[in-house]
A protein has these predicted regions:
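Peptidyl-prolyl cis-trans isomerase
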Residues: 38, 42-86
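Proteostasis/folding factors centered on peptidyl-prolyl cis-trans isomerases
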Residues: 1-30, 84-117
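Short, cationic low-complexity segments
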Residues: 29-40
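Short amphipathic alpha-helical segments, especially helix-boundary/capping motifs
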Residues: 16-18, 34-35, 65-66
Length: 117
């Protein structure tokens, strides 16, 4: 299980290592930890309510993710051990293929992860 592939929906907040949204170009420095988690929980609930498929997840990642991968439905491509931040990689590894994680915190912010490989 060395190679993985995931989509993600990232919400940055004031504590993110680079608090700037790649989707909007705006600062996220005024977004609190609590509001970022609460917003991500709403997306988690909406994705599950709509049917947690890769297509549904990609739609929401395109709509809201603060990562530049929003343009590709949150797709990060194939990666191996050590290619991503440890917390994110662990979140991906602990998520079954074709399913979504719970909320994962990394230095970049809060993520939902949909593992595709």
């Amino acid at each position: 299980m060395s190679q993985m592939r995931c989509r993600h929906l990232l919400i940055k907040y004031s504590g993110s290592r680079n608090p700037v949204s790649r989707r909007t170009g705006g600062s996220t420095a005024s977004v609190s930890d609590e509001s970022a988690k609460a917003e991500l929980q709403q997306y988690f609930d909406a994705i599950n309510a709509e049917g947690c498929t890769e297509e549904v997840f990609a739609k929401y990642a395109t709509k809201r993710s603060d990562c530049g991968s929003f343009k590709d439905g949150g797709d990060l491509g194939v990666f191996g051990p050590g290619d991503m931040q440890a917390a994110f990689e662990e979140g991906c590894r602990n998520t079954a293929v074709n399913s979504m994680s719970g909320i994962v915190l990394s230095d970049s912010g809060y993520h939902l992860i949909f593992r595709t490989m």
